[in-house]
Amino acid sequence: MAELRLEHIYKYYDQKEAAVDDFNLHIKDKEFIVFVGPSGCGKSTTLRMVAGLEDITKGDFYIGDTRVNDIAPKDRDIAMVFQNYALYPHMTVYDNIAFGLKLRKMPKPEIKKRVEEAAKMLGLTEYLHRKPKALSGGQRQRVALGRAIVRDAKVFLMDEPLSNLDAKLRVQMRAEIIKLHQRLQTTTIYVTHDQTEALTMATRIVVMKNGKIQQIGTPKDVYEHPENVFVGGFIGSPAMNFFKGKLTDGAIQIGSAALSVPEGKMKMLREKGYAGKDVIFGIRPEDIHDELIVVESYKNSSITAKINVAELLGSEIMVYSRIGDQDFIARIDARHDIHAGEELTVAFDMNKAHFFDSETEIRIRS
């Protein structure tokens, strides 16, 4: 097991722009850390620097108390699981899992013991003598996980391991990886562009954009208290709604609509000097309620809007509408029989409102 420290890490491929820019992170022993962000944000590059597959341009990387910048990948005691499984097609499942142990010239009885234990853990015992082409995508990914497990490494690195699987298998494998971590308690860094994977799997999430960390926090913290507009829009599905508006006396004015702001939030905004100024107002789709559950405290934050699109998703309906020229999505109860072109009264739960500076897009906080 191990703690990891990444201190002021930079990666340049040329001298113009950093692919990874001043990355700072302390990973505690047994944590499951997820790097999440859009393509090209630097998450896989950071993971490859941890693995030793990319050189660190500047900064220090420690495993425990040992600085490992110049230590070869094979000597870092790290096991990596790749997106494309990286299995040898001519080898059996047993030999694929055992391959790294054989390279280290481990005694055959110990190899057999480790492979069989990993296979039992991953439900692969009956497939040990098959070759990868005879396995499903999920089974191949389990083999790749097994190869990492038998290493008994200090750290597991996983680079988009589920992206080649279909939706149903991804859900199943997410649960299996979580259970595996709970059992092994190995410090893990997991890279994904899928915010659902980040929210469901992580001890802490590291949200990245353009090579920079945007926010580090628990899934709950990142979801409920996004540091900026990017994080609010990237984490959560559907994404947070954003409106450009002006703070007036006790309300946010969005076009012709005025939504009452709770006194506590309004007091904080006044103290920060935002009274009478333009701000960005954010609210999640589940915090916009339909008229069936509008309570007294929401009366001053309700509007009647035309439905542009209504998507029935079983127990809920995604309603696409707009205030003035600004679109929004509301997630409402499927008890409504509603259709595009109709009008619906919805209320905004302003206790769940988020306010961001209109220029910096950073969250306004007390």
Predicted regions and their residues:
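ABC ATPase nucleotide-binding domain
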Residues: 5, 26, 62, 246, ...
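ABC nucleotide-binding domain "signature motif"
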Residues: 57-67, 213
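Glycine/charge-rich catalytic "coupling/switch" loops of P-loop NTPases
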Residues: 249-307, 337-366
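ABC ATPase nucleotide-binding domains
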Residues: 71-230
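Helix-to-loop junction immediately C-terminal to a conserved catalytic motif
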Residues: 51
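Pre-Walker A (P-loop) beta-loop-beta motif of ABC nucleotide-binding domains
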Residues: 23-34
